[in-house]
Structures are given as structure tokens and as C-alpha cells.
Amino acid sequence: MGHPKKPRKQYDTPSHPWNADRIKEENRLANKYGLKNKKEIWKAESRVKRYRRDARIILGMDIDERADKEKELLDHLVRAGFISPNAKLEEVLDLNVEDILRRRLQSLVFKRGLSHTAKEARLFVVHGHITLNGKKINAPGHLVEKADEENIDFYPGSSVAKQFETQETEEVAAEEEPKDEE
């Protein structure tokens, strides 16, 4: 079981430390999603491996045992937003790291336009400027379920929210001025 003060690692490190292709891919992902370090990529990889392993185990079961476990896994992945609602179990084997990284709070803040860059989205989350369902979440790696995706917003009274809104209104006003001159 392990010691309560020392929980088990949630990821596996690469088997070989100096693989140029892997390092380039990890750097690309870190830049695209604004990640702090490679550990965040390795955690996502471990999650993908776990889902794919579960799918392979379920595919190998007898049909009568398989139905409940298949429905349970697919419902979990659909609720999390990793696969589409009408996906089959075989499609779970096509999951990749980017599917997991897209569901992080940090990525969704950037995608919804609440920040200019992915790194800025991380900063907003860590500094407590972002809420999810009205609750302040300060973990950029928090995986957001599909149903909660629309409930991401700035914390009420956040100074960043006020600055961001004034910048947006200034940009909209600047875009409208040339249209009036024509």
C-alpha cells in the first residue's frame, strides 16, 4: 500500500533519457499547452496508457462480462470529454496525449479566450483568477468535464478580469472605427 505521506507516483519516466525525437515532441507539447515541465506530459501519457490498457482488457473479456465494464469505461471517457458520445470501445485505443492535455483547465481557459497565451492562462489559474462552477480552482492541470466546460469564467472582482474586459472593449471599439469611416 505504501506510506500515506509518500503517495505513489502518478507517472512513469521515459525508459531512455536522451531520445531526440521524444524530446522534440515533448518540447512541442510543452510550448503548445504552456506546461511547466515534462512531468505534466508524463502524467497525461500515463493516463492514456491506463485507459488504453483497460480497453484492451475489456476487449479480451467474454461478451457477457464485457457489457457492464465497457459501458462504465465509455461513460467515464465521454463525461470527461476525451471521446465522442457515440464512440466504440475500439476508439479508446486511438486516444493520445493531446486528447488529455486539451481537457486541462489551463488549456480550456486559453481556448475560451480568457487569456492571450497558454502560459498566461496558467498564470491566471495559479493566481486564483479563474473559477469553475463558481469555485476558485488554482490547479492548471485540473481535468474539466465536458458538462463543466461552459462554466469557466473569471473570479468575480478579479483585477485581471476587469483589465481583460477593458482591453476587449478597446479592441472592439478600435475595430469598429475603420468600418464607420468607409
UniProtKB/Swiss-Prot annotation:
Top-rank taxon, per record: Archaea
Composition-biased stretches (Acidic residues): 167-182
Domain S4 RNA-binding: 103-170
Pfam families, A to Z: S4
GO cellular component term of the entry, any: small ribosomal subunit
Chain spans, region Disordered: 1-23, 158-182
Biological process, per Gene Ontology: ribosomal small subunit biogenesis; translation
Gene Ontology MF terms in the entry: rRNA binding; structural constituent of ribosome
Keywords associated with the record: Ribonucleoprotein, Ribosomal protein, RNA-binding, rRNA-binding
Residues in coiled coil: none
InterPro entries (UniProt xref): Ribosomal_uS4, Ribosomal_uS4_arc, Ribosomal_uS4_CS, Ribosomal_uS4_euk/arc, Ribosomal_uS4_N, S4_RNA-bd, S4_RNA-bd_sf
Claim: Ribonucleoprotein is one of the keywords in the record: yes
PANTHER family named in the record: 30S 40S RIBOSOMAL PROTEIN (PTHR11831), 40S RIBOSOMAL PROTEIN S9 (PTHR11831:SF5)
Assembly and oligomerization: Part of the 30S ribosomal subunit. Contacts protein S5. The interaction surface between S4 and S5 is involved in control of translational fidelity.
Family from the record: Belongs to the universal ribosomal protein uS4 family.
Role, per record: One of the primary rRNA binding proteins, it binds directly to 16S rRNA where it nucleates assembly of the body of the 30S subunit. With S5 and S12 plays an important role in translational accuracy.
Protein name: Small ribosomal subunit protein uS4
Organism from which the protein derives: Methanosphaera stadtmanae (strain ATCC 43021 / DSM 3091 / JCM 11832 / MCB-3)
Organism lineage string: Archaea, Methanobacteriati, Methanobacteriota, Methanomada group, Methanobacteria
Designated gene of the protein: rps4
